[in-house]
């Protein structure tokens, strides 16, 4: 019999924060380019150990705005590394941190100006099958 690992209670889980940012660049950047730009900046400033500890992850991107997830204890290091980005593809680039929030929804409302952000719900297969049969 296979035993499943127990999930950690909320008090022991790593706390996350969401950094809203704006990119100032001449051309539109693709999501992959932004991920590489952020990853490179955090690695240069914070090192591989610090990068794994901060765990930066691009959650939302719609040029020129984006939301980056990181660990609560390392928010300041990630913000500092974003500010230090100076050029990309031999052109000047600047990333402005708009603010930090505890949820993606509040970051979108407060810093990106999205009035009613879409919520993603998990739809059960049974409901989908029932709707298709009707």
UniProtKB/Swiss-Prot annotation:
Any one biological process term the GO annotation gives: tRNA 5'-leader removal
Catalytic activities: Endonucleolytic cleavage of RNA, removing 5'-extranucleotides from tRNA precursor
SUPFAM superfamilies assigned to the protein according to its UniProt record, in alphabetical order: Rnp2-like
Enzyme class: hydrolase
Compartment list: Cytoplasm
Principal location listed in the UniProt entry: cytoplasm
Keyword field contains Cytoplasm: yes
Gene3D superfamilies: Ribonuclease P, Pop5 subunit (3.30.70.3250)
Signal peptide: none
Keywords on record: Cytoplasm, Endonuclease, Hydrolase, Nuclease, tRNA processing
EC number: 3.1.26.5
GO MF entries: ribonuclease P activity
Pfam families according to UniProt: RNase_P_Rpp14
GO cellular component, one term: ribonuclease P complex
Record's keyword annotation contains Transferase: no
PANTHER family documented for this protein: RIBONUCLEASE P PROTEIN SUBUNIT P14, RIBONUCLEASE P_MRP PROTEIN SUBUNIT POP5
Assembly with partners or alone: Consists of a catalytic RNA component and at least 4-5 protein subunits. Forms a subcomplex with Rnp3 which stimulates the catalytic RNA.
Record's function text: Part of ribonuclease P, a protein complex that generates mature tRNA molecules by cleaving their 5'-ends.
Homology family: Belongs to the eukaryotic/archaeal RNase P protein component 2 family.
Protein name: Ribonuclease P protein component 2
Gene name tied to this protein: rnp2
């Amino acid at each position: 019999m296979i035993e499943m690992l127990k999930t950690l209670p909320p008090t022991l889980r790593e706390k996350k924060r969401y950094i809203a940012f704006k990119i100032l660049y001449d051309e539109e950047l693709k999501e992959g380019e932004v991920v590489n730009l952020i990853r490179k900046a955090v690695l240069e400033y914070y090192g591989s150990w610090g990068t794994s500890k901060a765990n930066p992850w691009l959650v939302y991107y719609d040029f020129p705005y984006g939301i980056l997830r990181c660990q609560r204890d390392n928010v300041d290091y990630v913000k500092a590394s974003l500010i230090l980005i100076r050029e990309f593809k031999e052109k000047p680039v600047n990333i402005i941190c708009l603010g930090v929030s505890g949820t993606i929804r509040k970051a979108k409302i407060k810093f990106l100006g999205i009035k009613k952000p879409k919520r993603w719900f998990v739809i059960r297969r049974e409901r989908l099958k029932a709707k298709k049969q009707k």
